[in-house]
Amino acid sequence: MSGVAIARGSAADVDAVMRIMDAAFDPAFGEAWNRAQVLGILALGDVWLDLATPAGAESPEGFALARRTLDEAELLLLAVRPEARRQGIGEALVEAVAAEAGVRGGLRLLLEMRDGNPALSLYARTGFGQIGRRRDYYRGRDRSLHDALTLARPLARDPIDT
């Protein structure tokens, strides 16, 4: 994770976000958001964008978009350009989001992802565990159905789990 600078982003960074997202998300699954969706969520309260730039890079190679609602935070999107993967960028982004979520009062960090997404290993390494499954939740561009996995990571002592 050393050598990755994390900076808070804003709507002014949407071009960088879209560049990363277009490269990172497989169009077969239709998981990427469009520009209007990114700008729309950034306009809401308690939403933040983190940008990750590895040492020596001129521009961000990854981003994370998250929000807090009451005592939970949700990692909405995390993407790293394919050529920049396996350099600790994803892990640095997860840790930055978790830290900010805790500062904002989150007790746990949630995310939802397609079953079979290779990022599952990243989330397992960074303390997430599966807490739910939605059968046939996602529909790929080829009309195939994929389960959604709900993952959670505790950020502080969660009174629900006591």
Whereabouts are the PLM-identified features?
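Generic structural signal for residues in well-ordered beta-strands
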Residues: 4-6
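Terminal substrate-recognition subdomain of acyl/acetyltransferases
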Residues: 2, 143-162
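Acetyl-CoA-dependent GNAT
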Residues: 8-85, 91-96, 100, 104, ...
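Short glycine-rich hinge loops at helix-strand junctions in the catalytic core
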Residues: 88, 127
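Short glycine/proline-centered loop/turn elements that form peptide/ligand docking sites
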Residues: 59, 90, 94, 116-119, ...
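Conserved catalytic-core motifs of GNAT/GCN5-like acyltransferases
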Residues: 110-112, 129-150
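Conserved GNAT acetyl-CoA-binding A-motif
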Residues: 101-114, 122
